[in-house]
Amino acid sequence: MYNRYQQMNSAYLNLEDLIKEAGLTIPSGLCSSSSASENPFPEPIQYVCAPARKLKFMLVGTHAHQTTGYSKVTYHIIQELAKHRDEFEVFHFGFQKFMAQPTDYRNYPPGIDVHDPVEVEKSGAAPKEMGFGFSQLPAYVRKVKPDVMLIYNDAGVICQFLDKLSSELSASERNYKLIIYLDQVYEIQRPQFLARIDQDAHSYFAFTMYWKQVLQKQGIKKPIHVLRHGFDPTQFKPMDRGAARKKHGIPENLFIFLNLNRNTPRKRHDIVVQAFAHLVARNPTKPLALLEVCDGGEGGGYPIQEIYMRTLESLNVPIQHHAHKLMISKQSLTYTDELINELYVLSDVGITAADGEGFGLCQFEAMGIGIPQVVPLIGGFRDFCTPDNSQLVVPKYRSYLALGSSSIGGIAELVDPFDLSIAAENYVMDSDLRTRHGEAARRTVLGYEWSKEVGNLIRVLRDVAKE
């Protein structure tokens, strides 16, 4: 019995000799084995392979401590990638961190390397570039040497980053695979922007399938994937409406329309307040209110209060009886996610008249807690707003944008204020419809899970790692 075992053991120990006799080879450096022992009962041979190198992934996008929609998306992308730290090293070139946040606000996971261009600009060590840090990116690339870089923004900003990289880095220093996560808000992109981006891009991500098709129609032949925004039900969730209204001093019987968009030209607050004036004119005795969570035009946007008053006057409505129904909150960029959740909860309906929309995160989040929306049938809204969960308003006008007012150009799709007011009125007059659409809206948005959406990016990164 002992001799038989010894023969078996000897054959086992001479495995490499047997392989050589068979004319096979073992790749050098791939594996190493433990040496043979004089012990007639040695330990099993252990082959120890070098661990696979992690893929270095660099995200160039808004800092997670900003309060914009961009920042929410970058935050959740990083959170999901951090769950795969055995595969990826994650680096974030996080621009436009203009404000300090509480220590518990959107903390980065351990092990994430974050570069803050704003901090460097403030120190005087780099030129001031609106917090984007275009001039700082090449040095960060040299430091990190990423395998894959993803740039997330609109075409104009992306082109500025690409120009800076190509002018300051050699071809060998730009041997990363470049993925473009393109924010499209209008149906056309300026051809020179697309040509510049496509020159360097390895592949693309679009916000929705609709935007993927729009990009393909403009001649992009490289792979285009879809990375929709996700919804975090632990961050935005239903609360007691009565308690929220009491906290903010809002009467329980008030019917509130909420617009949480910034007062920028694209968001068309002028159309929203005109529509609300039409609604008030037709329903003067109803306790209606429009809460505009933005500045009143002091920052260069629409003079909301003035437009509302003039529209009431043009409709022969006594201004003094209805001026108070427009409520303007002027601190939209400093609101935390917790406070935004309360604003969603205390509202009855959300409303917007944006003439272009990449995704529509404000409407999306409100729908996630059961607040139905009145929206134009455009862009990103097409993905999650349907006749079964929203009031959709078909745009009546299309207008090319002057480059002096919009550097990215495009065709704006404009709804008529009167049409928007009719859609809003449907919810005022039909509480059952409002409830039904709110429930359907929540079901729809709960299906957008960050883990699933970012999973599309992870699959692409794994494929790139195999190339």
Where are these regions (language model features)?
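Aromatic "clamp/platform" in nucleotide-sugar-dependent glycosyltransferases that forms part
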Residues: 355
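A charged, aromatic-enriched C-terminal amphipathic alpha-helix characteristic of glycosyltransferases
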Residues: 415, 419, 429-459
